[in-house]
């Protein structure tokens, strides 16, 4: 396997890219310290799952990401209860305004 030259991606920070493996490392003279991106990739995957869950929460028939089984329609039920409470409070305010 042919060794490709390292590509400097940020010379001011001495960061280089190994094009054959896709690893980012710090260049110290002729030596390179290889940094593992596995932990960062795991955090990015977790963030993507959370963002997808936020988008899916706009559909009232979906379930939250870490919920127990059988929780389909929880957003729909929460929306109905919230609207009932708002309607009750608004009705009380109108009733008191008419009585005074």
Curated annotation (Swiss-Prot):
One of its GO terms (biological process) is methylation. Pathway: One-carbon metabolism; methanogenesis from CO(2); methyl-coenzyme M from 5,10-methylene-5,6,7,8-tetrahydromethanopterin: step 2/2. It is found in: Cell membrane. InterPro entries: MtrB_MeTrfase. The chain crosses the membrane at residues 80-100. Pfam families: MtrB. GO terms for molecular function: tetrahydromethanopterin S-methyltransferase activity. It catalyses: 5-methyl-5,6,7,8-tetrahydromethanopterin + coenzyme M + 2 Na(+)(in) = 5,6,7,8-tetrahydromethanopterin + methyl-coenzyme M + 2 Na(+)(out). Belongs to the MtrB family. This is Tetrahydromethanopterin S-methyltransferase subunit B.
């Amino acid at each position: 396997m042919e060794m490709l030259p390292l590509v400097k991606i940020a010379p001011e920070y001495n960061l280089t890219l190994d094009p054959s493996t896709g690893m980012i490392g710090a260049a110290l003279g002729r030596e390179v310290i290889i940094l593992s991106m596995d932990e960062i990739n795991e955090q990015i995957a977790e963030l993507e799952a959370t963002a997808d869950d936020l988008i899916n929460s706009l559909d009232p028939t979906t379930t939250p990401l870490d919920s127990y089984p059988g929780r389909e329609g929880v957003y729909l039920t929460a929306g109905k209860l919230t609207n009932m409470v708002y309607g009750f409070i608004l009705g009380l305010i109108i009733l008191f305004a008419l009585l005074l």
